[in-house]
């Protein structure tokens, strides 16, 4: 019986370790907002220890618009998580009237496609960073939509975090 409880504790700790964590700032400013504009910035992304991200891209055939396609998976999963909170993630456009923007910034991708990511929340009027969220995602290295699986997982993890923090 004791082994069973240790196993359950291990599973719970693994699940909690993989989720998104607010590491700086607060999301209190988001309360009352209807949406947040989201963009993907891969400019800081490195492959393995310090190789250019392009080496990862060159491992398989990729769609030309893989960033845009990857974000579609993020929006779907994030919005499924936050639907009951009446809050949604939307693409960055000039028509977006929301006050805040989230920039998803992948930092490091390993050989199998797993990614370490920061998501930064900015006040669009002042350009002030109000929060930093950190998480890791599983992935693969040969998907035509390069970050499809990581963006699905990011959508779920960040959506779940926002849902909890918006209560």
Region annotations inferred by a language model:
Residues 4-13:
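Sec-dependent N-terminal signal peptides
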Residues 85-145:
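Surface-exposed short loop/turn segments
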Residues 16-72, 164-167:
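A structural "domain/chain start" motif
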């Amino acid at each position: 019986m004791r082994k069973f409880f240790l196993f359950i504790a291990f599973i719970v700790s693994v699940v909690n370790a993989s989720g998104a964590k607010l590491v700086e700032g607060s999301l209190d400013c988001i309360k009352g907002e209807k949406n947040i504009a989201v963009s993907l910035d891969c400019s800081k992304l490195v492959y393995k220890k310090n190789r250019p991200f392009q080496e990862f891209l060159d491992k398989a055939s990729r769609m030309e618009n893989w960033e845009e396609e990857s974000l579609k998976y993020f929006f779907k999963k994030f919005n499924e998580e936050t639907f009951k909170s009446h809050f949604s993630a939307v693409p960055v456009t000039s028509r977006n009237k929301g006050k805040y923007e989230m920039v998803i910034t992948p930092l490091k991708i390993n050989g199998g496609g797993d990614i370490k990511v920061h998501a930064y929340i900015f006040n669009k009027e002042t350009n002030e960073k109000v929060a930093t969220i950190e998480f890791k995602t599983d992935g693969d290295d040969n998907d035509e939509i390069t970050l499809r699986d990581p963006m699905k997982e990011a959508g779920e993890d960040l959506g779940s975090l926002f849902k909890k923090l918006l209560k």
